[in-house]
Amino acid sequence: HDRPKFCYLPADPGECMA
């Protein structure tokens, strides 16, 4: 996980962008 991105399913908190 480097840059934040939109949440995908299944998504990790570190991969979610508000």
From Swiss-Prot:
Location of this chain's protein in the cell: Secreted
BPTI/Kunitz inhibitor domain segment(s): 7-18
Site feature Reactive bond for chymotrypsin, where: 17-18
Cellular component per GO, a single term: extracellular region
Record keyword DNA-binding present: no
Entry superkingdom: Eukaryota
Principal subcellular localization: secreted
Keywords assigned: Disulfide bond, Protease inhibitor, Secreted, Serine protease inhibitor
A GO term, aspect molecular function: serine-type endopeptidase inhibitor activity
Tissue localization of expression: Expressed by the venom gland.
Family, as annotated: Belongs to the venom Kunitz-type family.
Its biological purpose: Serine protease inhibitor that inhibits chymotrypsin.
Name of the molecule in the record: Kunitz-type serine protease inhibitor C9
Organism annotation: Daboia siamensis
